[in-house]
Amino acid sequence: MRTRTLIPFGAAIGLLASASAVVVSQARTPYLLVLNKDDATLALVDLKTNAVAGRVGTGEGPHEITVSSDGAMAFVGNYGGQTPGSTISVIDLAARKEIRRVDLGALRRPHGLAFADGKLYFTAEVNRAVARYDPATGQIDWLLGTGQATTHMILVNKDASRMFTANIGGDSVSVIERGASPLAWNVTVVPVGKGPEGIDISPDGKEVWTAHSRDGGVSIIDVAARKVTQTIDLQTKRSNRLKFTPDGKLVLISDVDTGDVVVVDVAGRREAKRVHVGKSPEGILIAPDGGRAYVAVSGDNNVAIIDLKTLAIAGRISTGIDPDGMAYVER
């Protein structure tokens, strides 16, 4: 025979209220993290309201930012100004404060950043190198030279077994792959166009695209073959960043000199549209749901919001002076 336990009405209401409280407590707020180079600050933008919810000071000339896998910490490369920078700011996002400024010693101009497998990978432009910082020990525990001038941006896969760097001065992309042991690495230098800077990997992991800042082209690299299979002439004046949409259908490229974001149809390998966003667009971040792109318009001191369905500007956010690098986090 089945037995049933009857819960008094008042207790049932209490249980429902408790369940609702749990749901509310688990609700997370999306934030856009924006670096303001001239202000030397990180602005935290609440994307529910598009208002700046807080600011944190960084080192001089913060250019790029990434976030730990758990969303607790942000890491900022302090590129410097006339004097090359040599520090990385570690920021507690809950407390909204810098908790450590990592001294990189002889490594200069930290730039591209990526967090993978519990560690921070970054480029050191002056040193033509990629290095790794372990937050658990507070130490730089790995360093690899690329042999290429101005190693600028970096992409790293989830287990940190493969990475790609855009080498502006070397007119190349370095494909860096772990060998038979964690200490063995293989580097393939892939020649591309003039001044590769913006770089991203397709969502399916099969292609790396890099935009040339000095000849208006985009090189498409077959990851498996480690070679360029196609070059698209987009006639950009000075491309800066390149990002895929999450569905892999579009690529967005910022053109600093024209003030445009060039939208590329990936399947057709052709320009689909140009969206004029303002003076000197630089960093690009695309929301994980693929609905919007955020473009740091450094010359106008704002972040333009592009609706990726209509490919029209949907708003602007004032974050500080000379915005550039951005990251996304939910807390």
Enumerate the language-model features and the residues they cover.
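Predominantly soluble domains enriched in secretory-pathway, periplasmic, or organellar proteins
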Residues: 4, 10-331
